[in-house]
């Protein structure tokens, strides 16, 4: 029987690349996002299904997992939002947007998915170096990622006896559409470094709680 993966934030960028890689690894992938992914993921309808879902809405998330209704071998919490700037310049709306999606949304997804996980399942959190360090002008984003670092670590301990592995991946700058204007774009991490890491963990018997991936250029250094 084909294994099943669920990837959030799959409409473009890293999420789309993760979904595509898992399809190539033989998984049937359910992609959760607010906007429809590119035609690339729909090339083989027997390997991918898009589920429209705003993960910051707990009821939409609950209904999405009920609609899928399948046991999940791999859950990739990838969806997230980033805004750069000093805390004094950030609006209340920005605070809500980042916390609602990056923290609450990820928790909603993980909570809804938990009843469909079983021994041997893997849960991934696409975190950030901002979840490990204090980075100037990223106060809200870093706070959201630090929250996920703690959440993933504790969840991993809680699920260990159930045979479910939890891995938090902390990449530096990634070459995605979000980084189009970065003057050091040619020195960013290739998305393949993240997808290769996921596949490595899936093929390994070892448990990796935290994985750090640094590009040559790191703005926090």
Predicted feature locations:
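Residue(s) in the substrate-gating loop at a strand-loop-helix junction
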Residues: 128
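C-terminal helical subdomain
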Residues: 168, 183-221
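Alpha-helical segment proximal to the catalytic Tyr-Lys
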Residues: 115, 157-161
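Active-site helix of classical SDR
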Residues: 110, 144
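N-terminal Rossmann NAD(P)H-binding glycine-rich loop of SDR-like oxidoreductase domains
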Residues: 11, 19
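Conserved NAD(P)H cofactor-binding loop of Rossmann-fold oxidoreductase domains
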Residues: 78-83
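Substrate-binding pocket helix/loop in short-chain dehydrogenase/reductase
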Residues: 86-87, 94-99
